[in-house]
């Protein structure tokens, strides 16, 4: 989403007191409450990579580009990740799935979610073939579907249809844990924003990742 985002008014800086800098150029946000959830924003340059840990489970949202694959794998290993319960490709641009392909080979992956469209790149084909080689079926969740995760859950907010614009195909999720909530947008742009508004779902959140 664009920085002048009108969809959500709450901004990340309101929660700077929750942030703890950790090695490997990552930022960790710990959700408050009785049940802890740690959200690691991993610095992969232009792309996106977010690790969420809760209740012994792990969720990886995007993996940056291919040049950051070793960093992603190393960081996950440092966090004692052995199984990725949910791997989510927001969309299939290189700077979002490049680091996911080797993660499929290096970790036990239970579920892979992505938007239901075909990208023309060789990397997309490699991503799909690697999933198939590891006996994983890529799933395409619908808007409004909710999945239990750790001590919380996440709900799919977008895409509500497929666009010619790859960014607007981003699989957007809202992650909730107790009174804390996060929205991960991939590269969703204005068309996707308007679609999310039209659904009438609750789009308030504590932390918005854009």
Question: Residue spans of the language-model regions?
Answer:
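Non-globular, low-confidence helical/coil segments that flank catalytic cores
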Residues: 2-7, 17-210
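Acidic, serine/threonine-rich, charge-biased low-complexity segments
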Residues: 11-14
């Amino acid at each position: 989403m664009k920085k002048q985002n009108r969809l959500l008014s709450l901004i990340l800086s309101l929660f700077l007191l929750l942030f703890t800098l950790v090695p490997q150029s990552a930022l960790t946000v710990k959700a408050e409450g009785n049940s802890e959830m740690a959200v690691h924003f991993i610095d992969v340059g232009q792309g996106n990579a977010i690790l969420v840990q809760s209740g012994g489970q792990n969720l990886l949202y995007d993996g940056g580009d291919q040049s950051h694959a070793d960093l992603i794998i190393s960081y996950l290993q440092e966090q004692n990740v052995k199984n990725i319960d949910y791997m989510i490709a927001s969309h299939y641009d290189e700077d979002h799935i490049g680091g996911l392909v080797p993660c499929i080979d290096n970790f036990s992956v239970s579920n892979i979610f992505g938007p239901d469209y075909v990208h023309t790149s060789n990397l997309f084909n490699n991503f799909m073939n690697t999933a198939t080689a590891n006996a994983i079926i890529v799933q395409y969740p619908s808007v409004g579907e909710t999945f239990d995760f750790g001590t919380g859950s996440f709900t799919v907010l977008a895409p509500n249809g497929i666009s010619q614009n790859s960014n607007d195909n981003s699989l957007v999720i809202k992650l909730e844990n107790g009174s804390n909530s996060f929205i991960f947008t991939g590269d969703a742009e204005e068309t996707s924003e308007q679609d999310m508004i039209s659904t009438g779902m609750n789009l308030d959140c504590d932390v918005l990742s854009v």
